[in-house]
Amino acid sequence: MYLYPMVEDLQINQGSKAEIYQSLIPQITALIYGEADLVANLANVSAALKEQFNWLWVGFYLVKEDELVLGPFQGPVACTRIKKGRGVCGTAWQDAKTLIVDDVEKFPGHIACSSLSRSEIVVPIIRNGEVIGVLDVDSEAPGHFDDTDKKFLEEIVAGVIFEFLPRRT
C-alpha cells in the first residue's frame, strides 16, 4: 500500500491546462487520503482547485431530499438551496451529466448567485447510479471551460472524491 505524504502547501504549476490538472490530481489525493470527513475533504478539494486556477467560485452542493444544499466552497457567498432542474446545478443533477455553459446569461433559468459569473461547469457526483451532489465552478470569463476541464474535473470527482465519500447504507 502506498502512503500519500501530507500536503501542507500546493505546488502551483505552469504549463498546459492538462499538465496543470495532471500535477494537481495527486496533490488532491494526498490532501484527502485517510481523512473520512466529507466536509473536510470537499473543503480541501475546493481550496486546491480555487488556489490553482483562481476561478471565481469553486464548491459543492449536496443532495438533501428534493434539493441541492450548499456545501464547502471557496469564493463569494452563494445560493444556499437549488431545486432539481433549476439553473445549471439543478439541471446537471436532473440530467446526471456534466454541463459546460459558455455564457450563463444565455442559459435558460440560470440562477445568478453572483453578477460576476460569466461561464460555468457543473459535474455531478454519482454513487451507485444516483447523483448525490455536484461540483460547481464559475469563471468571470465567458467561454472559460472546455473539454479538458470536463475530463479532469470528472476524473477528480469520480476517481478521487468518489473513493473518499462515506458509503451510504
Predicted regions and their residues:
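Intrinsically disordered, low-complexity terminal regulatory regions
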Residues: 2-72, 163-169
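Short hydrophobic/aromatic beta-strand element in the GNAT-like acyltransferase core
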Residues: 57, 122, 134
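A short, aliphatic-rich beta-strand micro-motif
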Residues: 119-126
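Sensory-domain boundary capping and coupling elements
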Residues: 126-139
